[in-house]
């Protein structure tokens, strides 16, 4: 939920209010076309709000703070504003927010010390299965803990200018390092818990930002996190981004999918 922590308006990815988090790619590069076929664009009506990942033909995983009653998704998009014949639109039939996510923070524009944005993940059941193609492919959940120091790739259409809210046209990628959670704990007064990951570049300049919430953090080729929250302006030195740690939630995800075939 890229709730930007200064101004973390849950604008991050579309949540009109989430405190300390914001998401967009800063200091990155244009992703190679169709190189992230699992990346999903999550909308509220016709408004882009967040990223997400395709888990299988029926399910998308995104951040809980991206929740709206009228979520829908586009799969296989590269350019956010162009019609692309290979892209697929799907309505969402049902949303499953993690039961421990604190919804009272969902639209709170004021962030407070010790606010806890843990459990920031949500499953979206598609109304019609996605067609799996060369440009629309699912990604597997992690089976092992990520290793500190791993090279991670984050992607999204979030703002590419730290102090200005302006979505990217083309899907952006950025390389980050997986850092100790202590680095994020020192950077923020909000809680950094064991269900979160800390990733960034110590000198700043590279980060996710507003609009990137819910998008993937892929470390050493494995999906390990979802963009959740961080500092505004994005990319500041000693202000890494915070991500939902997916290895902690694989059982909940698998159980939810199995119980809702």
From Swiss-Prot:
Glandular kallikreins cleave Met-Lys and Arg-Ser bonds in kininogen to release Lys-bradykinin. Residues 1-18 form the signal peptide. It comes from Mus musculus. The keyword Glycoprotein applies. GO terms for biological process: bradykinin biosynthetic process; cardiac muscle contraction; left ventricular cardiac muscle tissue morphogenesis; proteolysis; regulation of systemic arterial blood pressure; tissue kallikrein-kinin cascade; vasodilation. It catalyses: Preferential cleavage of Arg-|-Xaa bonds in small molecule substrates. Highly selective action to release kallidin (lysyl-bradykinin) from kininogen involves hydrolysis of Met-|-Xaa or Leu-|-Xaa. PANTHER family: KALLIKREIN-1 (PTHR24271:SF47), KALLIKREIN-RELATED (PTHR24271). Belongs to the peptidase S1 family. Kallikrein subfamily. This is Kallikrein 1-related peptidase b1. Its EC number is 3.4.21.35. GO terms for molecular function: serine-type endopeptidase activity. The keyword Nucleus does not apply. The active site is at residues 65, 120, 213. The gene is Klk1b1. Residues 25-258 form the Peptidase S1 domain. Disulfide bonds join 31-173, 50-66, 152-219, 184-198, 209-234. Residues 19-24 form a propeptide. Keywords: Disulfide bond, Glycoprotein, Hydrolase, Protease, Serine protease, Signal, Zymogen. Gene3D superfamilies: Trypsin-like serine proteases. Glycans are attached at residue 102.
């Amino acid at each position: 939920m890229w709730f930007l922590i200064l101004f973390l308006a849950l604008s991050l990815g579309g949540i009109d209010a989430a405190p300390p988090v914001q998401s967009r790619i800063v200091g990155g590069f244009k992703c190679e076309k169709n190189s992230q076929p699992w990346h999903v664009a999550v909308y509220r009506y016709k408004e882009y709000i967040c990223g997400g990942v395709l888990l299988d033909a029926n399910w998308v995983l995104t951040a809980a703070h991206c929740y709206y009653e009228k979520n829908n998704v586009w799969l296989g998009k590269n350019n956010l504003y162009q019609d692309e014949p290979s892209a697929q639109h799907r309505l969402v039939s049902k949303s499953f927010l993690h039961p421990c996510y604190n919804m009272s923070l969902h639209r709170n524009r004021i962030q407070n010390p010790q606010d806890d944005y843990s459990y920031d993940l949500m499953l979206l059941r598609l109304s019609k299965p996605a067609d799996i193609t060369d440009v629309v492919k699912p990604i597997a959940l992690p089976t092992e803990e990520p290793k500190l120091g791993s090279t991670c790739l984050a992607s999204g259409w979030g703002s590419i200018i730290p102090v200005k809210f302006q979505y990217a046209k083309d899907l952006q990628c950025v390389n980050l390092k997986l850092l100790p959670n202590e680095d994020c704990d020192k950077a923020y007064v909000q809680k950094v818990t064991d269900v979160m990951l800390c990733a960034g570049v110590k000198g700043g300049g590279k980060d996710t930002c507003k609009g990137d919430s819910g998008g993937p953090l892929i470390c050493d080729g494995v999906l390990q996190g979802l963009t959740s929250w961080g500092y505004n302006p994005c990319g500041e030195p000693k202000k890494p981004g915070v991500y939902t740690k997916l290895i902690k939630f694989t059982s909940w995800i698998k159980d939810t999918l199995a119980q809702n075939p």
